[in-house]
Design a protein with these regions (language model features):
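Flexible, acidic glycine-rich loops studded with aromatic residues
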Residues: 507, 522-529, 536, 540, ...
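Extended HEAT/HEAT-like alpha-solenoid repeat tracts in very large eukaryotic scaffold/adaptor proteins
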Residues: 503-514, 518
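Conserved NB-ARC/NACHT P-loop NTPase core of NLR-like innate immune receptors
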Residues: 2, 8-465, 482-484, 491-501, ...
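Secondary-structure edge/capping motif, primarily at the C-terminal ends of alpha-helices
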Residues: 106, 490, 519-526
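A broadly conserved detector of short glycine/acidic/proline-rich loop/turn motifs that flank catalytic sites
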Residues: 441, 470, 514
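Short acidic-capped amphipathic helix/loop micro-motif used as an active-site/signal-coupling element
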Residues: 465-481
Length: 583
């Protein structure tokens, strides 16, 4: 037996090999623990990433569903600014900067007064629409643009005030998610809510319900409000928009228009501290901007025609500026007409030899000289064409073929005249080649007493309504699209659209939809012969099978509700027209 001291010493001495094994085991365990912790951390991070991704997917899906819901229920019309329609570079700069600063509340006065509505007004042709496109571009660059609506009298989608609020609600909902959530919830809760039933108070309620503010001030721009609605519908729309802008600090409204009585009266009744008015005729830079624009347009003409420079010479150039009197449309129309003549130099001299009127009178005189040069005087067939063109414009821009059919003139004449009058008319490719006037002042000119081809809108409506009835009597027939099975729903007919295009001409489509719009104008008890003629045409139409064929076409086009509206309008008109007070 070993002494106690030896046993104790052996306990203190560790076998080096055993010590190494123990250390390796400890390191192995530490490494395994570290790897386990790392694996756990990776799994945690992966779970969190997957949860975040799922949240993002859910949010994206919710956003997509809400956007689809808004688009489906609000049915916003297509409208917006176009960069190529803005003011020429170097013009309107001071005014544009002033508007941008107003949006950004850069002045102490703007911060204190919170005048959140800006009304820019001026005469026809002064450049309001180009200015609106430039304003939209500037605001878009700075993330301030919420939406824009460019009114047009010759486009039914852009001439109805009822279309403005839905598109603004839709635009704001797209760029401001908290607002979108509120609108989407209301649409889900009320399946009967439609764009037509939306009240202005509802828009204001939407605005008030937003729990937070957008990062930037947001602006709605409405251009050419005078081309939308009438003197009864516009004030209500203006009240909704100005009330909304006055009640929340982050929303501003910019409106451009002519000084129509109802619009001017509305703003005069507002307190001056709630809005900013701006008369474009008082713009201090207007003359310099007009000269810059005119010089640019003439220089392009000089380059295209290889004319001597400078042209026009200083005296003629100044006379052009004087005649324009601030109207950019005068310059653009003059240059367009010179582009289409055989001798621009001689044509400019002729144009400047006219009377010394300026502004709008000078513009109308220019329109007259263009018509005189291209059409001549007392052209009865052209009268029919321009009458059909202007009368159908509020409903749809029609192509050459349809105008020719409804006016009862040869197609080649319509084509030639539209080409010749390129400074006044154009074919809108976005509307299937529909013919439009280049500027609303051209429409005003044709319906004024200053035009040799003056259009009496009421008489033109009646004559076009009769032409629509004649078109339907001539072209309507049973099973017009030659369908094999009349029991099929429209959605079950694969080639329905191609059949419509092949068998239902554009003139027949237009006539079926709008004959009563033209025919049922307020009665004129001074012209009983016209009333007798109209009633006779209606009798011819309704005594045959044509009403059934008409309803068939409406059904194929998916426009059956138009039939009910038409008949209600017709019944009301017949009652009024045949009452003793009108006979």
């Amino acid at each position: 037996m070993k002494p106690v001291s030896s046993r104790f010493l052996s306990m203190l001495i560790v076998d080096p090999q055993a010590f190494g094994v123990e250390r390796e085991e400890r390191e192995r365990l530490e490494k395994a623990g570290r790897l386990e912790r790392e694996r756990t951390e990776r799994e945690r991070m992966e779970r969190e990433r997957m949860e975040r991704d799922q949240v993002e997917r859910d949010r994206a899906e919710q956003d997509r569903a809400e956007q689809e819901l808004l688009f489906r229920r609000l049915k916003p019309v297509e409208t917006g600014y176009h960069r190529n329609l803005r003011c020429m570079d170097g013009t309107r700069e001071s005014l544009l900067n002033q508007i941008v600063n107003w949006v950004a509340n850069k002045s102490e006065q703007d911060k204190v007064l919170q005048r959140n509505t800006y009304w820019l007004y001026g005469s026809p042709g002064i450049g309001k629409t180009s200015l609106s496109h430039s304003i939209c571009e500037k605001l878009h660059e700075r993330n301030h643009l919420a939406g824009a609506f460019f009114c047009r009298r010759d486009d039914p989608n852009l001439s109805e005030p009822i279309n403005i609020l839905p598109i603004f609600i839709h635009k704001l909902a797209i760029i401001f998610p908290p607002f979108r959530a509120i609108v989407a919830k209301l649409l889900r809760d009320d399946p009967n809510l439609t764009p037509e039933s939306m009240k202005g108070s509802l828009f204001i309620d939407f605005i008030h319900s937003v729990p937070c503010h957008p990062e930037h001030t947001l602006v709605f721009v409405i251009d050419a409000l005078d081309e939308c609605g009438n003197n009864r519908s516009r004030p209500g729309l203006l009240k909704v928009l100005t009330d909304a802008a006055a009640q929340v600090p982050w929303l501003k409204i910019i409106i451009t228009s002519r000084t129509e009585v109802d619009i001017q009266r509305f703003f005069e009744n507002l307190t001056q501290s709630s809005y900013l008015p701006y008369d474009l005729a008082t713009d201090q830079d207007a003359d310099a901007d007009l000269r810059t624009f005119a010089r640019n347009q003439f220089d392009l003409l000089v380059s295209d025609w290889h004319l001597p420079t400078p042209w026009p010479e200083v005296g003629d150039f100044n006379r052009v500026i004087t005649r324009a009197n601030g109207l950019f449309i005068f310059i653009s129309t003059l240059v367009l007409s010179l582009e289409r003549c055989e001798d621009p130099e001689e044509s400019l001299k002729t144009a400047l030899q006219e009377s010394a009127v300026t502004g709008l009178e000078s513009l109308y005189e220019l329109y007259s000289s263009i018509l005189k040069a291209k059409i001549g005087h007392n052209n009865t067939e052209f009268q029919l064409v321009i009458r059909a063109l202007l009368t159908t414009a509020p409903y749809r821009a029609l192509c050459d073929e349809t105008i020719a059919e409804l006016a009862g003139v040869k197609l080649n004449l319509v084509k030639r005249w539209v080409d010749a009058l390129g400074s006044l008319l154009y074919r809108d490719e976005s509307a299937n080649g529909g013919i439009r006037v280049r500027h609303l002042s051209i429409y005003d000119f044709f319906v004024s007493g200053r035009c040799d081809y003056q259009v009496n809108v009421r008489d033109a409506d009646v004559q076009l309504g009769i032409a629509c009835l004649k078109t339907m009597v001539t072209k309507l027939r049973f099973n017009i699209c030659k369908l094999e099975d009349s029991r099929l729903a429209n959605a079950e007919i694969d080639d329905l659209q191609s059949r419509i295009k092949e068998y239902i001409s554009d003139s027949l489509q237009y006539s079926c939809l709008h004959w009563s719009d033209h025919l049922c104008v307020p009665p004129d008890n001074r012209d009983q012969q016209v009333l007798v003629l109209v009633l006779g045409r209606l009798k011819q139409f309704f005594e045959g099978l044509y009403p059934l064929f008409w309803v068939e076409v409406l059904g194929i086009m998916g426009m059956v509700p138009v039939g009910a509206q038409t008949l209600r309008r017709l019944i009301s008109w017949v009652r009024v027209s045949t009452s003793p007070s009108c006979c």
